[in-house]
Amino acid sequence: RSSDLGRDGYRSTMFAIIAVFILLLVDFREIIWAFIGMIPLLFGAVWMVGIMEISGLKLNMMNIMAIPLIIGIGIDDGVHILHRYKIERNTGLVYRSTGKAVLLTTLTTMLGFGSLWFATYRGLGSMGISLFIGVGTCFLSTLFIVPMVFGIKEKLFASPGEK
């Protein structure tokens, strides 16, 4: 039943979001870094839904199943960038070093999922496109939104002599 599917999709998505946030808290040991780590997912999800709406892609059973996968995969780029930023404290250096690796791993993941578009079963193709878009938008969010957040964080939480 579609109502069961929607409810299960919602539950699995909420579980994935909460689990990822807890893991970020354990990893970074600071709530501010855990929230920053969630930013690529938030913006990536909004952009993904927007792209799907504009392009006429409808949510279906396979797309709903893709959402927890996007959460699990979409968080990776941001985590790598955050860890490097905590070491370097220089956004340009972070993106020149770790950014290259993150770009290549994201592109290979997107191509792997995008290849599902050619599947005979249309549901699998739809899932592949959703994953392609979702992973891509999470990456773009990591690339464009996270550096702005770094700047804001540094200004808000810098010691008085650093402001």
Residue positions per predicted region:
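Membrane-embedded transmembrane helical bundles of large multi-pass transporters/channels
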Residues: 1-163
